[in-house]
């Protein structure tokens, strides 16, 4: 028996999950899927809350959805109320694991989290998957990124760089290992996470809100994200995107993909693939191009 830990970060989904695929095909016989919640009172070095109430509630909805999906596949998500540097080494030791697989994130705080795990003796395999286009396919070294977006876009278009085909959701997972109750208690977790108190979204919404995340259509889960993408395309809203995208209030002036992209409940490559299919079926115009343009803008910044 061998176990690999999969650490969910800003990738709270099962569709188009190269990092999860890497864990499932690592040769391990068992999989322990883990997410670590930041403490409610955690502060940045500048004294601000690291995660605000609205983001915490929206992310919690994503986690509830992920719980349901993974439980249906026979391997419930382990939600820990302890930082990764505390929780993951304890869990790894308890189940005899030496390797953690996770999403690669190019940010100092997140890189420091990975460094702490390696310093604790764990092997950490990181997989880049958050952008539309992989940095490795760019026609320049990472340290020679064009200084302005327009140059970046033009070079990408001239080079004909296209996103990878998004991966399908797994239809099965490796079985979970047994984790001693004492270890679960030490990392503030219960397998299946039924007793973890996740913040609830607000009930109802202000009619002026451009993203009322307390309503079913704006739920934080992967299922809601994919349903939103499907209805957005079914209503042919990409054709009018460029004309309406700079509105300030209401639900339908822009794509509203950003909140789900931020938590990773929606993959940019899935958006691109579905948008390309939409263009084949209904035609391309400035609006559909501008949606792709904005995904590329997200990559650059």
Region annotations inferred by a language model:
Residues 143-301:
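Glycine/tryptophan-enriched, flexible segments
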Residues 1-169:
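Trp/Phe/Arg-rich N-terminal binding region typifying the photolyase-homology
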């Amino acid at each position: 028996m061998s176990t690999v830990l999969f650490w969910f970060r800003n990738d709270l989904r099962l569709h188009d999950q190269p990092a999860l695929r890497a864990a499932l095909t690592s040769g391990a016989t068992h999989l322990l899927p883990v997410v670590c919640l930041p403490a409610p009172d955690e502060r940045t070095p500048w004294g601000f809350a690291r995660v605000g109430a609205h983001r915490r509630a929206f992310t919690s909805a994503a986690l509830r959805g992920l719980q349901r999906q993974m439980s249906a596949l026979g391997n419930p998500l382990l939600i820990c109320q302890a930082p990764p540097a505390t929780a993951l080494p304890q869990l790894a030791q308890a189940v005899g694991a030496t390797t953690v697989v996770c999403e690669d994130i190019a940010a100092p705080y997140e890189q420091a989290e990975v460094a702490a795990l390696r310093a604790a003796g764990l092997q950490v395999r990181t997989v880049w998957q958050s952008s539309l286009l992989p940095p490795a396919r760019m026609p320049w070294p990472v340290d020679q990124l064009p200084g302005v977006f327009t140059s970046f876009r033009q070079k990408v278009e001239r080079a004909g760089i296209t996103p990878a085909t998004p991966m399908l959701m797994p239809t099965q997972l490796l079985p979970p290992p047994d984790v001693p109750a004492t270890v679960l208690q030490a990392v503030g977790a219960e397998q299946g996470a039924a007793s973890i108190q996740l913040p609830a979204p607000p009930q109802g919404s202000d009619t002026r809100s451009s993203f009322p995340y307390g309503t079913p259509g704006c739920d934080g889960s992967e299922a809601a994200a994919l349903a939103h993408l499907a209805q957005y395309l079914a209503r042919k809203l990409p054709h009018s995107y460029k004309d309406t995208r700079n509105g300030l209030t209401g639900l339908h002036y822009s794509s509203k993909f950003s909140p789900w992209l931020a938590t990773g409940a929606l993959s940019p490559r899935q958006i691109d693939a579905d948008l390309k299919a939409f263009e084949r079926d209904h035609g391309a115009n400035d609006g559909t191009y501008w949606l792709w343009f904005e995904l590329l803008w997200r990559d650059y910044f």
